[in-house]
Each structure stands twice: as structure tokens, then as C-alpha cells.
Amino acid sequence: MARICLSLNRLKVAVIPVLALLAAGCGDSRSAKAPPLAENEASRIVPALDPVGMPRLRDSTLFELSYPAAELKGGSVKLHAGEWKDSLTPDNLREAYLTMVAHGDLNGDSLRDAVVILYTDPGSTRKFFRLIPVIASTTKEPEMLGGTVGYGAFLGDRVKPESLWIDGHRVWLRMVEPAKGDDPCCPTLWQQRTYRLVRDSLKLETTIPLGNHD
């Protein structure tokens, strides 16, 4: 029976959630597969300004960038409409896509940056998640920001990100990761992490255990 493992963020900064991260039985090698953000959000029109009236990176910009992915050939992946599939492999087994996006100021320049979670499947039982910053910059169009992809943080294999937001120039993440003795497919350790941007890289700042997650 599938479990819904992805919750909506209810805190201060608006977050664009994906639908649900489905975890099938422990014997399913694709149990940590998350639905693509673009696939579920493609019909939604996201305003260029967030509620406080400050310009932010458009999701359409984030969906077309290249992101680091060490387990894929070349070490990076160029997304189109928020996802990528390797058409040269049988059944498109290798793929990558965004599963979460949050907006907020990471470096104190009053521009709304973004942070994304990238899911990659290299065509094996292992499924990887990365937390990656996208640093906003001004363009000739006042309400259109450019984005530079920074260096992210590796979250792990078959972890379950649940909520993501930016507040106080920090990235906040709640996720479930394997505890000691867990089967890789079925993590139970619930944690809250904070990251801060140092130049163009995300650095882990705090980790707070939240207990076991059913």
C-alpha cells in the first residue's frame, strides 16, 4: 500500500509543493521515485511576484537550467520543462527531474533566490536527491530575474524530502532518511536541517532529530 510521504509547507515563505512522494513496498526498486514537479504543475500559472511584491525567479526559468548530477554521464543534466529522460536507454530508465522548489532571499541582496530538490535515477536501484541553490540576478526586464545554479548538497539515496522553505536567509528542510538498521528502501529517521549559502554553495548548518517517522 502506498504511503504519502510529501507534505505541504505551511510556514512563512511560499513553497511550490509537488503532489506526493509515493513509497511502494520495500521490494520495489523504484519505491523512492517522486513525481516530476513540472508534470504536476505545468497547468498552474505562477505569478512573477510573490505576495510581498518582490520579483522572484520564475519556475519556467528553473525548469530549463542545467543542474549537477555526478551519477549521470558528464556530471550534470540539462532539464526541459523540469525533467530529463535518457531516450537512448531501454524504457527511459535513466531520468532526472525537480521534485520541490522554494523561493526566498538566500544572500541578503533582497532578490528572491530559489532552492530546488533534484531527483536522479541512474538506471539502478539507487535513487538520488540533491538540494541545489539557484541565485537570482537582475536582468534588463525589471520583473524578470536570471538564475545561476550554485553548488548543492547531496541528500542521499532513497531519502524522502517532506517540506522545503526559505526563511532568515536559510534553507529549511524536513526529510526522512535511513536510520541505523533501516532497509535502504524504507527510511524512518525524521530530521529537520538548515543550510546557508556560502558564496555559491549550500553548507549544512544544523541537524535536529524529530523522531521516527512511520
Where are these regions (language model features)?
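C-terminal motif of bacterial Sec signal peptides marking the signal peptidase cleavage site
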Residues: 22-25
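Bacterial N-terminal signal peptides that target proteins for export
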Residues: 2-15
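Beta-propeller-forming repeat regions
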Residues: 27-106, 111-214
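C-terminal active-site/capping subdomain that shapes the small-molecule cofactor and substrate pocket
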Residues: 18
